[in-house]
């Protein structure tokens, strides 16, 4: 029964659509009508309000950190259930008819909560790719892939949950992948 409570509460917290909420409150607009139509931090940056974009990023990370850290210290056997549930909540939020963000910021929160080093693997991979390409989408895909690859090669660690999350991140970026392939993807300005 505990795992169901962990899964449901983590999903519900993960499903809070902060990009949607902040854009509605501060810009009186629906973020789904701006840029890519996505509710995540990168699209929140496209609103032209950097503070709103960074606030969305921080809150999307935090909504994963809270349940995962709580479970890590109170129900450690369920940490991957909490992680995947928070992630699925962000990507498929009940509040927005299961049309959510791409999951990257939530993934980062999960990584840092489970193991700071895993978070650093993602951040370093993301940063190097971004410095070279200026594509947030490509950087997110590379960073998301590097975590399970690192675990498989160096740690002999159960990486199935990280592989599942990478596959979902790849799925949520499928239009970006098409644009990258066709050299039509928009570069991102983060500062």
From Swiss-Prot:
Topology term for the membrane: Multi-pass membrane protein
E.C. code: 2.3.1.275
Keyword Cell membrane: yes
Compartments where located: Cell inner membrane
Pathway: Lipid metabolism; phospholipid metabolism
Top EC group: transferase
Catalytic activity, as annotated: an acyl phosphate + sn-glycerol 3-phosphate = a 1-acyl-sn-glycero-3-phosphate + phosphate
Cellular component annotations (GO), alphabetically ordered: plasma membrane
SMART domains referenced in this protein's UniProt entry, alphabetically: G3P_acyltransf
UniProt superkingdom: Bacteria
GO MF annotation, one: acyl-phosphate glycerol-3-phosphate acyltransferase activity
Biological processes, Gene Ontology terms: phospholipid biosynthetic process
Record key words, sorted: Cell inner membrane, Cell membrane, Lipid biosynthesis, Lipid metabolism, Membrane, Phospholipid biosynthesis, Phospholipid metabolism, Transferase, Transmembrane, Transmembrane helix
Family: Belongs to the PlsY family.
Protein name in UniProt: Glycerol-3-phosphate acyltransferase
Record organism: Pelagibacter ubique (strain HTCC1062)
Protein encoded by which gene: plsY
């Amino acid at each position: 029964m505990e795992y169901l409570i962990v899964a449901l509460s983590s999903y519900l917290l993960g499903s809070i659509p902060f990009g949607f909420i902040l854009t509605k409150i501060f810009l009186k607009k629906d973020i789904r009508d701006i840029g890519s139509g996505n509710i995540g931090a990168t699209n929140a940056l496209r609103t032209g309000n950097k503070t709103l974009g960074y606030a969305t990023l921080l809150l999307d990370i935090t909504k994963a950190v809270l349940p995962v850290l709580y479970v890590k210290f109170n129900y450690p056997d369920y940490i991957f259930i909490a992680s995947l549930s928070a992630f699925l909540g962000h990507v498929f939020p009940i509040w927005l008819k299961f049309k959510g963000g791409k999951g990257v910021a939530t993934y980062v929160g999960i990584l840092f909560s489970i193991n700071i080093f895993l978070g650093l693997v993602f951040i370093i991979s993301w940063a190097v790719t971004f410095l070279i390409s200026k594509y947030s989408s490509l950087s997110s895909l590379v960073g998301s892939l590097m975590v399970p690859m690192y675990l498989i090669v160096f740690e002999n660690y159960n990486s199935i949950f990280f592989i599942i999350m990478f596959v979902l991140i790849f799925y949520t970026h499928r239009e970006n992948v098409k644009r990258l392939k066709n050299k039509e993807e928009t570069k991102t300005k983060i500062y």
